[in-house]
């Protein structure tokens, strides 16, 4: 006997299926389900009178043969596709993406459910991989709370707290600070990795930081990013298979952008805030987007270009870089970095895939809780101003969605050598998953899983008779407590440090995971974001030309994902 359901009735019961479209928050972006791994008429759902019951959708298999958790009927949005599926989690990792149920009585089951399986209802929800923010100034530990609540589950950067150096530069300098920060990482339910200070013209001060646990090194102009320092730093990175991030020389004191590119010598490097408002060769650091060995990213205060972007940047810059507005030279330094033309071009370079990643620059000209929001605001603004991408159809924005989600998930993971652990929803990877109601997508997650365990969720009054009464707000869950914290998050270190036994020497509780394959990465490896245009910036007008085309757009006066969702 067959029961035919309308698409609306089916979506309300089991979530959208192949051919259904979902709007992302209040944007103009629509995603369309490309494939449904579940089987019509054999879907599993938990609840009274529902399918996942003993002898029905739940099998008799023992715990070793079933997942620890199944997320049912979820819409997965990832760089590799937009699909409807059940997601299996086992031992803190994604075990399978497919069809859950009881294989003894149901056809096509790839994920058996048993008495040892917990269920999270994913019907009507979107699931993304946890975000990865690769530009963190570790100024205050409270940033971690904000980042996690936004859907970020991995933070990479440097710092030691609100020291003057950390306020300006993402560096954890020296072995002593590196050890202390790695020990501090044990107290937070998030994956962490730290960059050492890369500014030295001799190798020994750099190598000792990698040996102490740094996942890479950061070159920052405030410490002197000279060609000699760049060359030395990249040589150490090549020797240790670690990444280098760079904030180039705004003042062009030690050379122009061409001098910096020459110092790279074709070696892989991650260029922070590549547009330049966050720092870098004025006015043409954007040129490096065309280099095969350069992995370019943006920071979020210029994302997207709005009528307020320029005005807020001057004060931010003066504070972050310890400048004095009463000193003419300091003011000129600040003003040289803030250019409406290059910020406008940055929008388009993201939309066309020339800028590969997006990060925060937390408390140092960036907002740690807004990486994901600003990524999707940029995508919306570009659709409104530029229309559909050539790869998309009139029905959906699937390719654009994949391009933008890759900017804060898989591409940062590839860049920093952690893609074997995090960055996408694929079997074998750490189960850092973010669940969203479509109306709140990119803004306020419903639930965040760390290593397969619920770490943060929207939760009502704990004294109420049910979970939903007000006040509903984010509350830490059991993955953040006791010994579970250290077993649901990772600390990334160098292979050199792992081999030297720093976990035991420092007394670390979290698992340490070495970064790997950092030095072979090229722009071509940046998924959906590998375009390498020939870029020029007019030194007088700051107009940006890419492959012969002028890149310009108007600032937005209103954005989605903003006042509709927030009081402040």
Swiss-Prot record:
Reaction equations catalysed: urea + 2 H2O + H(+) = hydrogencarbonate + 2 NH4(+)
Entry keyword annotation includes Chaperone: no
**Keyword flag Oxidoreductase:** no
User: For binding substrate, which residues are annotated in this chain's numbering?
Assistant: 220
The subcellular location is: Cytoplasm
Give the residues the record marks as binding Ni(2+) 2: 218, 247, 273
Give the Urease domain ranges: 130-568
Mind telling me what this protein is named? Answer: Urease subunit alpha
Organism equals Burkholderia multivorans (strain ATCC 17616 / 249)
What gene name is given for the protein in this entry? ureC
